[in-house]
Structure formats: structure tokens, C-alpha cells
Amino acid sequence: MYFPRIRDVREDSDKTQKDIADLLYISQQQYSLYERGEREMPLSYLYALAKFYGVSADYLLGLTDRIT
């Protein structure tokens, strides 16, 4: 699945794919696959990103427009 908000919040935070990959202890290439929707992102990564960005997982998934 492709969730453009994952990319959008990263760019809004002025972070690179490498920055976020390092946070998740994965390669930039692996993170890129998740961001483009070519691989399913594990829930543990999704929750880590939500916590890091201070938004809800539902927001990242596009299920709500409420940030928190």
C-alpha cells in the first residue's frame, strides 16, 4: 500500500529518507521501498514513525485528517 502522508510528514520535517532509515535501523533503500508502497511497512515501524513525528498512526495511514 502507498501512503503519501508518510513521505509528506518526512519532507515537512526536513528529514531525508536516510535520516528516517537510521531511526528505524534499516537501510535507506529499504525505507524507500516502504515509502513508495513497494513493500508493506511493519506496524512497529509505523508506530515508531507516528511517535517520532508526534502524529497518530491513523493520520499517517490517511484514515483521519486529525493529526493527533
Question: Residue locations for each model-derived region?
Answer:
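Conserved hydrophobic/aromatic packing and binding residues within compact polymer-binding modules
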Residues: I6, I20-A21, Y31-Y34, L60
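DNA major-groove recognition helix of helix-turn-helix/homeodomain DNA-binding modules
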Residues: Y25, S44-Y59
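Recognition helix of helix-turn-helix/homeodomain-like DNA-binding domains
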Residues: Y25-E40
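Short, basic-rich loop-to-helix N-cap that marks the start of a DNA-contacting helix
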Residues: E38-A48, I67
